[in-house]
Regions:
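Bacterial Sec-dependent N-terminal signal peptides
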Residues: 1-25, 673
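Amphipathic, charged-and-aliphatic alpha-helical interface segments
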Residues: 52-104, 121-126, 195, 199-201
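Long, low-complexity intrinsically disordered regulatory regions enriched in P/S/T/G and acidic residues
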Residues: 20-63
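Outer membrane beta-barrel
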Residues: 208-301, 416, 421-437, 576-594
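Exposed, low-structure sequence patches enriched in small/polar residues
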Residues: 168-172, 276, 329-364, 372-673
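Outer-membrane beta-barrel proteins
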Residues: 194-212, 265-272, 326-329, 401-403, ...
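Alpha-helical interaction/regulatory segments in DNA maintenance proteins
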Residues: 45-60, 89, 97-100, 108-144, ...
Length: 673
């Protein structure tokens, strides 16, 4: 009874807030407006696929090195991923006509930029003096005016896992360090060293200390060379059917954001997956004609068959036990590719070709039906053509690809600004069950650019500045088996979200209904319909230095049985000038099982978007402190505890904790010099 009473108190704790008319305010529990913006766009599909984390890192990097609007190129504007296609076009046109602008406030003249978007722009752009020469700076200027940043992190668990006692070769602390040198948007040099809990440090295979290093050099605007990358980098072309090592567009983000453009970006991630290593360059060979060439060689982790062929390519990056270490860097991957793109009067046409070879043949286990058409062999190639027409009122984009499977994949999108307040979006895709690309990442329901056809329809309506309604419906058909469905299957996904803003209050309501087919008792029985309902109510309040957020999440899933889950959480924050900021949160969750799991955002560390998942019954507490003792030094500490009421052990296998609670402390320091 006490638990239920506490939940009611948490839900009603913000009931005394009074509303006023004004623009949207950044809510509690976020360090900035853009983090809350990303939170509102994220659903559990994006979180599990890693899209949210990828986008977070991109925006955090952009916040650290903002764009100078008076010297911004088309490529710079394309990096503002939170702008729609129409907003990008109108912003570019305005800057071309009115440079030099004197303040960001001038952008209010652009009709498509609402109050929220203008405030988002404030996070990532600034107005500097126009540079007529636009030449790459001298090395003397770079050495004198460049910025250094050193960032360190450690996570201390106040518990012991089974693997810590029996199998892991390293200590239980996770830590990483990152150094970066930057000269605005023109030059970035950096190195990251990362260590997962349980991995040996300066021991075993890690003679150089950390288990994983990421190093890069990225230069922009070197005359005709638009971008030059050395070391580790990520590449994206077209709509991602052939090459996309960056973030993918989810169903919610596709409704709001413009499709990311062709790009070469530095890889400063701690992840050991989805990056290239070598050299890449984008060159302007003629006005409005660019070409990109790249080459990569890197070691990869793999599970091998008895004949030394590759059974599975591993992307977890864990090297804690003898077994995991044996799979470390036991194969290599060589990749080369090229893209050419032509733009003229809003029309864009491009072509991409990618070739990949492995040191050992790929030979996956095809006894599972959903792996029947997985890539097999040693040498792989893919080619595609992408096309686009961009206009302030309408944008059309698409890509069609094939490869050595001789199968076809195509995706086509159209976005129409039907009126000043209404935008309509449609996305059609057809991915043959025989098509595959080792670097594809694009819009899909099943998470793969393979074995899927479907249609997505969405709308965003803003009847007035304080109200935004977003909705979509997506239908997908899988002609061959997929994970958890041994026969042809269908799914329908629907969402509606309403955001109401009356400063100092912001309210968000979200409801999602998803229907999909899955296996019944066994693979030979008929497929069973699985219905999933998810909802969220979020109330944010901000007044001067104080912020507060109340949130209620629910999940209701039916298949052969019902699974019900819900969570109510309350967070609050206080900021004292620029020196001290404190955020704290508490939540109670209760779910039947994993099917009704709940994800919720909480304040995390720098370069770490925190979106923990909960199932079972328990409570979550966290305290987040950030201080700046000097202008160039920032210290952050977070303590989080999860207490379960329905179990006396947490997790399983080597991750098992012989306790009903789990407490971690994270410490981070950032020094700019």
């Amino acid at each position: 009874m006490k638990k239920q009473a506490l939940a009611v108190v948490l839900m009603l704790s913000a009931s005394a807030i009074h509303a006023q008319n004004n623009i949207w305010q950044a809510p509690a529990g976020t360090s900035s407006l853009w983090e809350q913006f990303l939170d509102n766009l994220s659903d559990y599909d994006d979180i599990e696929a890693g899209n949210t984390e990828e986008m977070y890192e991109l925006l955090r990097e952009l916040e650290t090195n903002p764009i100078d609007l008076n010297n911004a190129t088309d490529d710079d504007i394309q990096r503002l991923v939170f702008l729609s296609n129409a907003q990008r076009e109108e912003l570019t046109e305005y800057l071309d006509r009115h440079r030099p602008i004197r303040s960001i406030g001038e952008l209010a003249m652009i009709k498509s930029l609402d109050n929220v978007t203008l405030r988002l722009l404030n996070c990532f752009v600034y107005v500097g003096n126009i540079d007529e020469s636009r030449k790459f700076p001298t090395w003397k200027e770079i050495a004198k005016h460049g910025k250094n940043e050193l960032l360190g992190y450690v996570k201390v668990p106040f518990y012991e896992r089974k693997g810590d006692r029996e199998a892991y070769l390293g200590y239980k602390y996770k830590h990483w360090i990152r150094y970066k040198y930057s000269y605005g948007q023109l030059l970035q040099v950096g190195i990251t060293g990362a260590q997962d809990a349980g991995e040996p440090f300066f021991g075993s295979h890690n003679k150089m200390g950390y288990d994983h290093y990421a190093f890069y050099v990225l230069a922009r605007k070197l005359g005709k060379i638009r971008t030059l990358a050395l070391g580790q980098y990520k590449a994206r072309f077209g709509l991602g059917l052939v090459m996309n090592a960056g973030f993918g567009m989810g169903k919610t983000t596709s409704q709001v954001l413009a499709t990311p453009q062709n790009s070469i970006t530095a890889n400063a991630s701690r992840s050991e997956a989805a990056y290239l290593q070598g050299v890449a360059s984008t060159i302007e060979i003629y006005k409005n004609i660019t070409t990109t060439a790249f080459a990569s060689y890197r070691k990869i982790d793999a599970t091998l068959n008895d004949d030394s062929t590759i059974k599975t390519i591993l992307k977890t990056g864990y090297h804690r036990t003898e077994t995991e270490i044996k799979k470390r860097h036991n194969a290599s991957q060589t990749t080369a590719g090229m893209n050419i793109n032509v733009k003229h009067n809003g029309i864009s046409v491009g072509a991409t070709a990618v070739y990949t070879a492995f040191s050992k043949d790929l030979k996956p286990d095809k006894s599972q039906a959903f792996r029947l058409y997985s890539p097999n062999g040693n040498n792989f190639w893919n080619v595609s053509i992408d096309y686009a027409y961009i206009h302030p009122r309408i944008s059309v984009k698409g890509e069609t690809a094939t490869g050595n499977s001789h199968a076809l994949a195509t995706i086509n999108t159209i976005s129409l600004k039907a009126s000043r307040t209404l935008t309509l979006t449609a996305i059609q895709r057809f991915y043959s069950y025989k098509y595959y690309s080792l670097f594809s990442r694009s819009f899909s329901d099943g998470g793969h650019v393979q074995n899927e056809s479907g249609m997505y329809l969405g709308a965003t309506w803003t009847p007035f500045s304080q109200l935004k309604i977003m909705a979509y419906s997506d239908y997908a058909y899988h002609p061959m088996p997929v994970y958890r469905a041994s026969k042809a299957s269908r799914s329908i996904d629907n969402l509606i979200q309403t955001s109401l803003s009356f400063s100092p209050v912001d309210i968000t309501l979200r409801y999602r209904l998803r229907l999909k087919q899955e296996n019944g008792a066994d693979a030979s029985s008929p497929l069973i319909d699985k219905t999933e309902h998810r909802g969220r109510f979020q109330l944010n309040y901000k007044q001067k230095s104080f912020t507060m957020r109340t949130q209620y999440d629910m999940a209701y899933t039916t298949k052969t049985s019902q699974s019900i889950g819900w969570m109510v959480s309350q967070s609050a924050g206080y900021k004292y000038k620029e020196r001290l900021e404190c955020n704290a949160g508490v939540g109670y969750f209760r779910t039947h099982d994993y099917d009704s799991r709940i994800y919720t955002y909480e304040r995390g560390m720098l370069y770490d978007f925190s979106f923990p998942m909960f199932y079972g019954e328990g409570m979550r507490f966290f305290l987040h402190l950030s201080t700046k003792p000097t202008k160039n030094l920032q210290l952050i500490c977070k303590v989080g505890t999860t207490k379960y009421f329905d179990r006396d052990k947490i997790s399983s296998g080597y991750q098992e904790i012989n306790d009903s609670k789990k407490t971690d402390m994270e410490i981070q320091a950032k020094w700019k010099f």
